[in-house]
Each structure stands twice: as C-alpha cells, then as structure tokens.
C-alpha cells in the first residue's frame, strides 16, 4: 500500500488586492517545483499588510514564501527546494535537478544587471547599463544555442551546430528553469513598461527558450499578472532625468 502523502501547503506573497498571486520570483519558483513534482498541494496567498493569526503562528515574522509539509514549517527558498527534491523523490516523484552544472548558473547575473539598469535615473549611464544587461542576455543565449554534452554525437565528424533543446538542461523543465524563468519574466515585463526595452530578436536561443516556457502550464499559470509586476516596480524603476 502506497504511503500517504503529508499535506503540502505553500504560502506565497499576495498581490495588490490581497488575494491573487503577487510579484515574487521565489514564490513562483517553488510553485513551479511543486507542480512539476506532481504532488497534491495547496497555495495560500498572504497579504503582507494583514497577516492572519494562523500565518503568524506558523511562521512568526517569517519571510515569504514558506512551506508547510505535514506539521513541519520550512523557510528559505533554497532550503525548501533542497528539501522537496530530497523527500519527493523517485520512483514516485520525478528528480528535477539539472544534469549539467552550467545549467544552474547560466543567466543568473541577468537579474543583477537588470536591477542596476532599471534603478538608474542618470541618462548618461543608461547606455552602459543597457549594454551590461545585453551582455548578460547574450551569455545566456550562447548557452542555450550551444549543444549540451548529451546532444553531441561523438561518433560523428560533422559539426553539431546549434542546440534545439527546449530548456536550460534539455527538453524537460528542471530546478534551474524554476529559478531563472520567473526572473526572466520580470525582466521582460518591467523593461518593456519602464524603458521601452525588449530582448533583441537576434537572441534566438532566449526567445526559443521563453516561447517553450510560456507553452508550459507549470510556468505560464504560475506567473503573476503583468500589472502586479509593473505595480511592484513602480517605485523601483527610476525615470531618466
């Protein structure tokens, strides 16, 4: 007889109405992990302005997101992810860790470059900061278009050319994608709204990656509304003057 699964509940930041999902890439990351694991779980949005007594008791002063697994409360996104990968394991649940270590780090500096770009109010610095963001996106594009070791046929003398894989580590979503995609989504939405900047079409690997990601329910259905992201960055994005 199969072992009964403990109750799993993810507490995430609520949006501006106090109910729908708010802008938080860490919350979306864990939402995606749980969905990909195929585990039964609940998601509870927490209005940060009015934390309920239940939430305060479970995680007094705790940062969102946090996880309730049975009676255990888990905090810290990285630790929660490690915990879920360890307890929700094969054969019952899929392993989500990337095979290639580079998949975990590729594109990770994009968000820092984006933050510097969007927070800058000095027009004289704008071009250089935009170039920094483009450079980081190009590094990701190069990784996505370069074949992974498992895509290379060592018996063939022909050049393997451009990788056609769907995601960072292959054709399935992994923990690496759960980490990067929510941040890339924010970059797209905020840069378009506050800088009129879009990811260049020349970055075909990045566009293919995002197109494949938006076709997956685990990503598309866990994204907050664009308006929530724009609102979260209203005070952060500095006008150039």
UniProtKB/Swiss-Prot annotation:
What is its EC class?
Answer: oxidoreductase
Which PROSITE patterns does this one have?
A: GST_CTER
Looking up Pfam families in the UniProt record yields: CLIC-like_N, GST_C_2
Localization in the cell: Nucleus; Nucleus membrane; Cytoplasm; Cell membrane
Provide the positions where the record notes the PTM Phosphoserine. Answer: 121, 156, 211
Show the segment(s) annotated as Required for insertion into the membrane. Answer: 2-90
This enzyme's EC code(s): 1.8.-.-, 1.8.5.1
Sites bearing Phosphotyrosine, chain numbering: 233
Name this protein carries in UniProt = Chloride intracellular channel protein 1
The organism named in the record is Rattus norvegicus
